[in-house]
């Protein structure tokens, strides 16, 4: 697989009629003197820019965040700081080569800079999310590399990684073991993956396979028990499987705001019983695990 050829082809996506005007707006922002704070809210401070809120709203929906840009608070659908803070005590990225698979607009990558990693690379084949990233990075001026690539390109990438984050991606794959193998192949020796996915309670090595959708999401294929997830990971070649955290998704973490379009968590759950999805399945819960490659 020729990664450079794929890069060239996908760069053309930035000329799509819904993306090109956004790119032009960003290019005309000019150079601005500002300061950056990488806390729960990724904050950019400085002399207010004209029409900055209008510019940011052109890039809706904002799924991950929050950000504050010259006084404009981008109240994203997900309060991504909650997940980041939950995981924060479980990793140290200093001098490590780090990838974030399905990085969206780069919120986690911006936060990870505080660890002084050797390399930060985001993978996400979404021109809109890359445009959001470029908008924020116009002011942050980070060295983060954003690739319009997916997990299937990871094993062919120029670098192998010490730590790969894969948060909220696995359940979108119809062949989860194949995806886990791709993550494995993207690691350097003794590398680690920090992964989260939906799970169901139970000791059996089984999974829920939704008929047509789960929590109104059509491309959810398998929701395993933790035991079944462990088996997938071992089959993919990982030498260890460590549960870090579990959590029930709440409306404090995911909710409607004026920065998204359409529905959010409250619309995905049964109106009379919020422990169930509208389809009658268990409400979304996540398990966070660390997988290690080990030496073979």
Swiss-Prot record:
Keywords: Transferase, tRNA processing. Pfam families: Methyltransf_9. Its EC number is 2.5.1.-. One of its GO terms (biological process) is tRNA wobble uridine modification. GO terms for molecular function: transferase activity, transferring alkyl or aryl (other than methyl) groups. Carboxy-S-adenosyl-L-methionine binds at residues 64, 78, 83, 102, 124-126, 151-152, 171, 286. It catalyses: carboxy-S-adenosyl-L-methionine + 5-hydroxyuridine(34) in tRNA = 5-carboxymethoxyuridine(34) in tRNA + S-adenosyl-L-homocysteine + H(+). NCBIfam families: PRK15068.1, tRNA 5-methoxyuridine(34)/uridine 5-oxyacetic acid(34) synthase CmoB. Belongs to the class I-like SAM-binding methyltransferase superfamily. CmoB family. Catalyzes carboxymethyl transfer from carboxy-S-adenosyl-L-methionine (Cx-SAM) to 5-hydroxyuridine (ho5U) to form 5-carboxymethoxyuridine (cmo5U) at position 34 in tRNAs. Homotetramer. This is tRNA U34 carboxymethyltransferase. It comes from Sulfurimonas denitrificans (strain ATCC 33889 / DSM 1251) (Thiomicrospira denitrificans (strain ATCC 33889 / DSM 1251)).
